[in-house]
Amino acid sequence: MSQGDSNPAAIPHAAEDIQGDDRWMSQHNRFVLDCKDKEPDVLFVGDSMVQLMQQYEIWRELFSPLHALNFGIGGDTTRHVLWRLKNGELENIKPKVIVVWVGTNNHENTAEEVAGGIEAIVQLINTRQPQAKIIVLGLLPRGEKPNPLRQKNAKVNQLLKVSLPKLANVQLLDIDGGFVHSDGAISCHDMFDFLHLTGGGYAKICKPLHELIMQLLEETPEEKQTTIA
């Protein structure tokens, strides 16, 4: 599904500086510097769902102790993440676990293309960081009431359930979270704008994610012993 040039969602591309302040590139450059200055065991990369996670106490509680870096940029698509990873954000580091969460902003792409873009990210990480275990977080439902974007995100997750097991070192973590109630509505207590998560919403995602990360870190006992020593 990640057919290279035939899939626009799998073609690396820097974000267009529409607003004119070059903040996207500034953030990317800061991440590249972080790669030179820090030694993360866990790397998070993606869009605002990753970026905003560090604004809540649960990041400091669960992920900061794991020497985690947060390379999330609001508005990013699979194309933008691919470009960033190809241009320095995987250099000078050797993380044990890499968490990928991106795709809900790929508005110009079909579900098949989005899934292919995510697969391309996984394949790139496998090439550049072969020691890393990769966790792909499933796309969340969005919008207060049922809508086509919810259906599209759900289809992306279904496609990834089939395709990701064929790739190395990766697993999909598709957390239900109970965000969609029995009447089909999403609560602002979970997603304050019916897209981005509240602190309580993040807790529903981050706790099972943290458990999986810890399991993967435990699978490298020799490295853990070295770290403790």
From Swiss-Prot:
Compartments reported by the entry: Cytoplasm
Q: What class of enzyme is it?
A: hydrolase
GO CC list: 1-alkyl-2-acetylglycerophosphocholine esterase complex; cytoplasm; cytosol; fibrillar center; plasma membrane
Cite the record's tissue specificity text.
Answer: Expressed in heart, brain, spleen, lung, liver, kidney and testis. Not expressed in skeletal muscle. Expressed in fetal as heterodimer and adult brain as homodimer. In neural cells, expressed in granule cells, astroglial cells, and oligodendrocytes.
Question: Which keywords, in A-to-Z order, does the entry hold?
Answer: Acetylation, Cytoplasm, Hydrolase, Lipid degradation, Lipid metabolism, Phosphoprotein
Q: Residues where N-acetylserine occurs?
A: S2
UniProt protein name: Platelet-activating factor acetylhydrolase IB subunit alpha2
Q: Which organism is it from?
A: Rattus norvegicus
